[in-house]
Amino acid sequence: MGHIYLKLNERLSQIWCNKYTIIILVMMVKILLFIKMLSNGFENIMDYTMENCRNIDYYYSKYVNSSPHYMGLMGNFLIQKSMEQSVALSLKSISLLVSVSENVIDFMIDLWLGTWVCLIVSAIDGSVDVATNATESVIDLVNGTVSSVADEIDDGLSGLTKVVNKVLSAVNDIQNFFKGNDDESDINDQVKKVNLTINGLRTLSIPSSIDDKLVKLSANTPDFDTVKNKTKQAIAVPFDIIRNEIKSINASKLVGDPQYLEVPAIDTSGVKICSDNKSEINEVFDTIRKVFNASTMTILIVFILAALSLIVYNAWAEWRQWIRLKRFRDQYRHQTIMLKNPFDDMADEKVPQNVDILETYHLVFNRYQSGFGRWLSRRISSKLETQRNIQWLVTYLTSSTSLTLLALGLCGILMCCVQFAIIAIISNKINGKETEKMMTSMSTAMNDTVQQGMTDWSKSANLYINDTETQINRQVFGWIQNTTDTVNGTVTDLIEDIDNAISKAFNGTILYKPMDTVMQCVIGNKLEAISTALTWVHNTAQVNLPRVNGSELYQQLQQNLTDSNSTTSSTAELPNSTSIATQLKDNLISAANKILSQYKNTVVIELIVSSVFLALYFFQIPVAGIILAAQKHKSKHNNQNRP
């Protein structure tokens, strides 16, 4: 071959495996492996989900397909028992109201009739007492006074009679003397007439039978006992009938027909939340798979282009380096020729000592580092020693060893940024609208199934309630019509009986009209009010039972479950259709986020390692400073020891 070094074409044959391309390829493989591991993790999640579809469907059917059935059983039992208890309590309340009403009516009748009797008795007894006392006083006065006066007159007239008789005897004698005895009979007749008149006055008296008539009027004052007894007996008849009817009622038979309480059958249609939504689940994972594929293709294209670009750059760099090598060779030959003394036999040994071949090599093969060092040193200082120290520091920091630390640190940080970006993209997809849309569709299907079952059950429950309401209104409150009609008739009869009693007692007297007016004010108006009240009860007595609203019941159930879950621990939460879909979504997202979190932790560790490499690179700066200080101290010490 003639030479032991590599020429340009031989160097270019190895350009594909340069260190920069190798680093790029290693980074590409690392990121591709990272993407592959993420993809495998999500594939495992999808496989696990699909493999457990049967279990998910089983628990879903237990909740959704069976819930309306068991809720219907529970609800029907509660409705039936509540209806029976409501009817029983209603009957008991009605029975109490019947007794209260009867007693109130009896009390009011006693109150009103008692008031009426009191008014009448007070008026009549007072009048009779006054009249009787006045009559007795007059009779006693008349009878006693006339007899006494007659006796006194009779005593007075006896003396007068003697005088008159003596006068009459004298007159009679004179008359007989002159005329004879013709008029003697006239004088005797006049005297006898006087005596007869006084005797008649003695026999004058007021008969005591007038007191008997007043006592009889007082005794005949009406007390309405017959009317009250008759009214109470008439009032008690319908109330007794009602009480007996209420006692004979069986509350369990009064409620509606239990056949209306339909129990939703357990749904065996095979609706499955997981199996029926495999397409949506696959769609979510397909979206994530597309992200992985797109990321893989992007990484491949970018890194392959970068590797090709570095290959081209290194080919150009190799060509430039080959030119510099040839220049270095020519420069070395030129310096050797220029420094060689043709008259000195030892010139071949002295020339290399005047040439710093290592510095020349550095200037040729580290062109950019040396150029940057010269530029930086001239900007910082004009002293030659300081400039050379700065150039040495740049050379130290840009050596292949130091640049290896810098490359590892920067490439590691770059790979971590790429991996973080991939994790962020996948996380956004998982927590994005696609997953939310899938879970919303599943939740809607579950809600529709449960709500339809609740609606069907509420319809059957309302039929049962309708039948119960009809039975109650017909068999319980239907009696009120008969009762109110009977009581109204009794009130009418009571008014007629009172009128008859007043008419019988006072008709044809001056007390009839006042007593009739008093009766109307005291009793008649109240009886008319009772009649009006009974008519109102007759028209309004009915029961209206509330109906079951399936939609409202379902919404309230969901709200109660939500409120209950918000105030209880997670282990005590009650599942509902929304929470099942949410839980499924949360489980999928949680599993995916757990994988992403694990890989994120791995990337964080890689970032820490890369940062350590970068810190080690910057640690070279104080090390270089220490070396410069040591060299300066050594140089100063050597100069002092030099003679």
Curated annotation (Swiss-Prot):
Intervals, Extracellular compartment: 1-21, 125-296, 427-606
Transmembrane portions of the chain: 22-42, 104-124, 297-317, 406-426, 607-627
GO process terms (BP): plasma membrane fusion involved in cytogamy
Glycan-bearing residues: 133, 143, 195, 229, 250, 277, 293, 447, 466, 482, 488, 507, 549, 560, 565, 576
Topology feature Cytoplasmic, residues: 43-103, 318-405, 628-643
Membrane topology according to the record: Multi-pass membrane protein
Protein localization: Cell membrane
Top-level taxonomic group: Eukaryota
Similarity comment text for this entry: Belongs to the PRM1 family.
Name of the protein in its database record: Plasma membrane fusion protein PRM1
Species: Kluyveromyces lactis (strain ATCC 8585 / CBS 2359 / DSM 70799 / NBRC 1267 / NRRL Y-1140 / WM37) (Yeast)
Gene it is expressed from: PRM1
